[in-house]
Amino acid sequence: MTDFKEFADVCKQIEHISSSLEMTDVVSDMLKSISTEELPVVTHFVMGDVFPAWSVEQLGVGTSLLYSALSESSGLSLKEIEDLVRSTGDIGETAVAALGKKKKNKKKNQASLSFFSEDAASVSISIMDVFERFLDISRYSGAGSQSSKMRNLQFLFNSSSSEEARYLARLTIEDLRIGVGEGIVRDAISKAFDVPAGDIERGFMLTNDLGLVAVAAKEGGIEEISKLRMELDRPIKMMLAQVTPSIEAAIKDLGMLAVEWKFDGARVQIHKKGDSINIFSRRLENVTLSLPDIVEAVKLHVKADSAILEGEAVAVDENGAPRAFQDILKRFRRKYDVETMVREIPLTLNLFDILYLNGDVLMDQSLLRRREQLVACVENCDSIKVDEQVLTDDVNVVNDIYAAALNGGHEGVMLKNPEASYSPGKRGKNWLKKKPIMETLDLVVIAAEWGYGKRANLIGSYALACFDPEDGKFLPIGKVATGFSDEQLAELTEVFSELIIGESGREIELKPDVVFEIAFEEIQKSTNYGSGYALRFPRLVNVREDKSPEEAETIDRIESIYLSQRG
């Protein structure tokens, strides 16, 4: 088994590399050197993930629990750990400093390790040891779960050198901070096992798991990769739409359009296997238990033995009109007394795509062919229906549909290439969206500041970033401090307190996890931010709990808006 120290050494090497090609070479060499059992684990670890995106397992360790584990393992007080976070600005460097200053208190350490019937201080830990402890942590719940998680974390830190602890601490909150994303890992797998990058990408699209793809590439190359299949209850990334400046531009780009309403709802991916139904949010979280009405509608009205469907769940009032987006999020968050919430906020499901049907993968088929099969297997009713679609290249017809969608209280229209296949996780011109001119941006919160005066205990100013899909980095684009109520600031402070990965004075660095919908007056060129742009008069519109950080606006989109402003 490979020692975790070897993984930490590779991470340290990568952290000092700026070239994506050099990073790819280092990751490739590491993937070639490890066992098949370790391969999927390391593939995820090097991206800062513990489990694949589709997995129901969630590590769920917040910074407060991590601080406590470092305190217990090092013998430093909790305040000393918090002070180290402020002085170093990084939880990894905090772990290095804390374990470097480790106080000699053998009695305390031995007591904390008795649960494991082994002396952690006397053994080195392997990569698989770390993964198995993380797996145990993810499965603890209920009374006593925090102390059980704590004991596992203590074991790991007591088994680690201070250098190993740097990456162990970061991995615990799934933010490795070495700049390795999916693109680099895809290319590293390709190079390590001599499989074309396109085949690796194809396998990833079908499985949503680069770990599985890496194992297939190692064991059988292209032949084994070609055997990878989409599977029920393993959600794949959802295809994304690009904003079009006008309907005329969309027709120029695509010619004939498949026009659909863009509903003001929450996107879902539904997996049906007989009467077993699982529903996943656009962040690939399993929300089945919160949506029993959608489950029942699919059972009754989708006539297929097995299927993977996509659609929008829309909250409606007594007249069938759409309710506020926040009401939908209440449904998705609800875990207790769900039936009461079902009565208070009923949902309808508008289906628009099908990716899998009765054992056949459909995503390579055209949108029109997929839609034919979707229509054939769904019985439309009040609770579930296939979204209406019109094929046209007439600007006036599209404008009429657009106006009808807006008058119905929805966001606008989707303009799709009727001949396009389905591309998981890809944003491009095959799917376009047209919304009103007052555009908003979905941006990731990467840092923040504690407030002043009566708001001193609240986080009140947030640093925003767009996404660069080429290297998986988040690029700062400005700050927002307006549009928040005191109640909202209190709620957000509670959320962000568990995402702190560094602190210096009033400034805090956050794990990129939360997406804000931001209104703005203008995008300007700026040398103050890493994106090269800044927002003029940004203000909060919504917290987009349904969106993942990687679904934030891309740097290309920011540049496009900037150029369009200039005419």
Swiss-Prot record:
Enzyme class: ligase
Record key words, sorted: ATP-binding, Cell cycle, Cell division, DNA damage, DNA recombination, DNA repair, DNA replication, Ligase, Magnesium, Metal-binding, Nucleotide-binding
Gene3D superfamilies for the chain: DNA ligase, ATP-dependent, N-terminal domain, DNA ligase/mRNA capping enzyme, Nucleic acid-binding proteins
Cell cycle listed as a keyword: yes
InterPro entries hit by this protein: ATP-dep_DNA_ligase, DNA_ligae_ATP-dep_bac/arc, DNA_ligase_ATP-dep, DNA_ligase_ATP-dep_C, DNA_ligase_ATP-dep_cent, DNA_ligase_ATP-dep_CS, DNA_ligase_ATP-dep_N, DNA_ligase_N_sf
Active site: 262 (n6-amp-lysine intermediate)
Binding site for ATP: 260, 267, 282, 312, 352, 427, 433
Keyword DNA repair listed: yes
EC number, as in UniProt: 6.5.1.1
PROSITE patterns, per database record: DNA_LIGASE_A1, DNA_LIGASE_A3
Any one GO MF annotation of this record: metal ion binding
Domain of life, per lineage: Archaea
CC cofactor: Mg(2+)
SUPFAM superfamilies with a match to the protein in the record: ATP-dependent DNA ligase DNA-binding domain, DNA ligase/mRNA capping enzyme, catalytic domain, Nucleic acid-binding proteins
Catalysed reaction equations from the record: ATP + (deoxyribonucleotide)n-3'-hydroxyl + 5'-phospho-(deoxyribonucleotide)m = (deoxyribonucleotide)n+m + AMP + diphosphate
Protein function: DNA ligase that seals nicks in double-stranded DNA during DNA replication, DNA recombination and DNA repair.
UniProt xrefs under PANTHER family: DNA LIGASE, DNA LIGASE 1/3 FAMILY MEMBER
Protein name: DNA ligase
Gene name in the database record: lig
